[in-house]
Curated annotation (Swiss-Prot):
The modification N5-methylglutamine is found at Q235. It comes from the Bacteria. InterPro entries: PCRF (IPR005139), Pep_chain_release_fac_I (IPR000352), Pep_chain_release_fac_I_sf (IPR045853), Prokaryotic/Mito_RF (IPR050057), RF-1 (IPR004373). It comes from Shigella boydii serotype 18 (strain CDC 3083-94 / BS512). Keywords: Cytoplasm, Methylation, Protein biosynthesis. GO terms for cellular component: cytoplasm. Pfam families: PCRF, RF-1. Methylated by PrmC. Methylation increases the termination efficiency of RF1. This is Peptide chain release factor 1. It is found in: Cytoplasm.
Length: 360
């Protein structure tokens, strides 16, 4: 491993020990905000520190085994020990490289998930409902909280569009690669000839930003309409104009929210989604401007980004970005998404490592 990388790891290991000491300090414990910030930093440094400690131990093992090579009686055992230690050292170096990759500051944040029915009419709306259920089951398994912000139901079930806020540890980092086009191939219930139809939905995943980081929105750039909410809600529904539609005139972005009974709460929710959408649009523009020849696995949430195809007759799901095909569609639709999410994260990390080695 390069001396510059070892020096960086030593500094991070020292900082980990320093933060550990600070967390035990009475003054730190009294300051809740500082305590939370240091706890987050400690958690982030723990994996690097542990991995680096293991690597240092393996270097000592290599040194010991090399010294034993001079002893004829110990040589065979020493050669075996040396081979194992070198293999372990290589594995740890790879892990450390991944742990040192620049972190996306948004990865630990909550996220807004939008699922929209695209081409395919009723069948697309039904599939949007299936996708939302799939993500909800995944969230449930990870103990995340799902809160529906706004939903427009399809005429025969499912959703024309649904927006939800998903809260928990590392939500955006796990779900961000879901943004893009999702295609379904199956026989609709209304199809008497047994023909397979193809429909599509788009998914967009955006980090929830703290108020301080939300883009400045000029109130003069907003058109706010109120209307009567429709859907569940008992007697209160259709009695007051509590639903909100906000249009951001410069970008044409429209957000509706009718989930709460209070107009004030709906407006606050709609503004937070609007801020996240404007931020996402700005990020996409920046990524396009910086786009090199390297592929970008992070979809824009645009229909043209073809992420996956879900083929029901064959029980097959294919991720087109990394040429991954699994015949485990039933499990995927029940929310077992890690088998699709992990490979794309690993591919993204491999791309980052390749970019770093090119810079060097």
């Amino acid at each position: 491993m390069k001396p510059s990388i070892v020096a960086k790891l030593e500094a991070l290991h020292e900082r980990h020990e320093e933060v550990q000491a600070l967390l035990g300090d009475a003054q730190t414990i009294a300051d809740q905000e500082r305590f939370r910030a240091l706890s987050r930093e400690y958690a982030q440094l723990s994996d690097v520190s542990r991995c680096f400690t293991d690597w240092q131990q393996v270097q000592e093992d290599i040194e010991t085994a090399q010294m034993m090579l001079d002893d004829p009686e110990m040589r065979e055992m020493a050669q075996d020990e040396l081979r194992k230690a070198k293999e372990k050292s290589e594995q740890l170096e790879q892990q450390l490289q991944v742990l040192l990759l620049p972190k996306d500051p948004d990865d630990e944040r909550n996220a807004f998930l939008e699922v929209r029915a695209g081409t395919g009419g009723d069948e697309a709306a039904l599939f949007a409902g299936d996708l939302f259920r799939m993500y909800s089951r995944y969230a449930e398994a990870r103990r995340w909280r799902v809160e529906i912000m706004s939903a427009s139901e399809g005429e025969h079930g499912g959703y024309k569009e649904i927006i939800a806020k998903i809260s928990g540890d590392g939500v955006y980092g796990r779900l961000k690669f879901e943004s893009g086009g999702h295609r379904v191939q199956r026989v609709p219930a209304t199809e008497s000839q047994g023909r397979i139809h193809t429909s599509a939905c788009t998914v967009a995943v955006m980090p929830e930003l703290p108020d301080a980081e939300l883009p400045d929105i000029n109130p003069a750039d907003l058109r706010i309409d109120t209307f009567r909410s429709s859907g569940a809600g008992g007697q209160h529904v259709n009695t007051t104009d509590s639903a909100i539609r906000i249009t951001h005139l410069p970008t044409g972005i429209v957000v509706e929210c009718q989930d709460e009974r209070s107009q004030h709460k709906n407006k606050a929710k709609a503004l937070s989604v609007l801020g996240a959408r404007i931020h996402a649009a700005e990020m996409a523009k920046r990524q396009q401007a910086e786009a090199s020849t390297r592929r970008n696995l992070l979809g824009s949430g645009d229909r043209s980004d073809r992420n996956r195809t879900y083929n029901f007759p064959q029980g097959r799901v294919t991720d087109h970005r990394i040429n991954l095909t699994l015949y485990r569609l039933d499990e995927v639709m029940e929310g077992k998404l890690d088998m699709l999410i992990e490979p794309i994260i690993q591919e993204h990390q491999a791309d980052q490592l390749a970019a770093l080695s090119e810079q060097e």
